[in-house]
Amino acid sequence: MKQIKVGNLELSDGHPKVCVPIVGENHDEVIEQAKKVVEMNPDIIEWRCDFFDSVYIDEVENMLIDLREVIKDIPLIFTFRTDGEGGEKFISNNSYYDLNVQVAKTGLAELIDVEAYSKDSIALDMIEEIHTAGAKVIGSNHHFNETPTREKIVETLMTMEELGADICKMAVMPSCEEDVKELVYGSIEANEKMIAPIVTMSMGELGAVTRVCGKTTGSVITFAAGVNTSAPGQMTIKQVRNILGINCDDIKDKNIFMIGFMGTGKTTISNALGYITGMPVVDIDKYIEEQEKVPDEV
């Protein structure tokens, strides 16, 4: 089992922790959302600074000071998601570098999200400076329009580990059930090959199941919706906790039936539940056809 300590929290690939984002656009919104998020009792909080109305370090630091007063000792991820990876704002590489390093030096965030794969030209030095400042790094990579191949998923996660990321995160957008499987199998393979813990997810409704099967894929963190969602497909923290809290041993003597229209993801969810619980997966349509053995028309 992989483990990494973040603040007072132990992350492990056998027990995914739940992170809730704060996406306020100004000081008052950030504080208001923070108070509501704290009431949800998340394991981790993420502040999406790209939603914030300023990128000046003095204003960001003042915001972090006030935010820390509200969230107390809950571990904090500082994230400025760039527009190139689905974020709210453009920022130059130099400004992105300086912002992340300066935030790390404040000591107000335990984890700094670094888009390590797409910014590999500056990532190595940035990660080294963040580590020197005493913070840990989530190396991240996001694909909002596609799902890369399984091989690319593995290669991307391993590259971010080589760049020095303490945790390696990848989020992709599926267009079909096969895309979700690529993410699941790619995550499992990467987790077996890597030393660093991983965080992976397939976004949108189609990929929602990947947010709750971290015990299978190896993800140490899953993201749930706060006051507002920060990515497609996020469930509420209550929904995520209810599913993650299922004891697989308690349901092995029961059956689960998936009912829905064609193309709604029944097969994908059934397969994922099968991975998690060890229960056999039966395609009822195929089963009925086999049992009926309808003869060809004469």
Can you name each region flagged by the protein language model?
Residues 271-298:
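Conserved substrate/cofactor phosphate-moiety recognition/catalytic segment
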Residues 261:
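P-loop (Walker A) phosphate-binding loop of NTP-binding proteins
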Residues 264:
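ATP-binding Walker
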Residues 111, 116-250:
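Catalytic alpha/beta core domains of metabolic enzymes, predominantly
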Residues 258:
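Hydrophobic anchor at the beta1->P-loop junction of P-loop NTPases
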Residues 17, 75-77, 136, 197-199, ...:
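Proline-centered loop/turn at the N-terminus of a beta-strand
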Residues 267:
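Walker A/P-loop
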Residues 2-3, 14-132, 142-146:
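Active-site beta->alpha loop and helix N-cap motifs at the rims of alpha/beta catalytic domains
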